[in-house]
């Protein structure tokens, strides 16, 4: 990700989770993005960590782009304080639009949807569909078991070492953003053209 990259997609839960540390981390990420003049691209909701994150960016004077499906908007969970809220028909469209609009990706704690979003864009980096950094903010040890599984997959021969190392991890939002800015894509074979995703 070039140092002038200004659009960061953040994937995180539509629930607040069991520990206050999760919301505190979402607020800290939002504040750091605003401080750096980065635009937040996210799932467009006002609930859970998603709402905490967006509110923190807005409080800091930053720009927020939300992408939400019609079905979720109809459930009245969309954030009405956004400058840019795009409503799409399907989850596939939502993920593709977020990926296209972002220069890099961060995963905060969340459930199936959060992990689905992150691992899709991570796979696109692996395949060479895009060359954008993918990072995990490990809050309160939440992602420890998942990171252990990735290490296990590499140890068992299902992930190449350079692909395992594509996942940037950290516990400090500012430090993680610095690592994303300094990231260079792995010198791996490009398997697919972006149009083939």
Describe the role of every protein-language-model region.
Residues 124:
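CoA-thioester-processing core
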Residues 1-102, 118, 139-174, 178-179, ...:
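A cross-family phosphate/adenosyl-ligand binding-site feature
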């Amino acid at each position: 990700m070039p140092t002038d990259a200004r659009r960061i997609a953040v994937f995180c839960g539509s629930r607040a989770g069991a520990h206050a540390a999760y919301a505190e981390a979402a607020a800290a990420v939002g504040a750091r993005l605003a401080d750096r003049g980065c635009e937040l691209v996210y799932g467009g909701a006002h609930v859970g960590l998603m709402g905490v994150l967006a509110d923190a960016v807005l409080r800091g004077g930053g720009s927020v782009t939300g992408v939400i499906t019609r079905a979720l908007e109809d459930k009245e969970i969309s954030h009405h304080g956004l400058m840019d809220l795009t409503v799409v028909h399907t989850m596939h469209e939502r993920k593709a639009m977020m990926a296209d609009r972002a220069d890099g990706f961060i995963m905060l704690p969340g459930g199936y949807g959060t992990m689905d979003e992150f691992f899709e864009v991570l796979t696109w980096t692996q395949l060479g569909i895009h060359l954008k950094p993918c990072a995990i903010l490990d809050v309160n040890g939440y992602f420890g078991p998942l990171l252990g599984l990735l290490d296990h997959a590499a140890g068992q021969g299902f992930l190449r070492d350079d692909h395992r190392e594509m996942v940037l991890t950290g516990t400090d939002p500012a430090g993680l953003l610095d690592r994303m800015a300094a990231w260079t894509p792995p010198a791996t074979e490009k398997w697919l053209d972006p149009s083939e995703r």
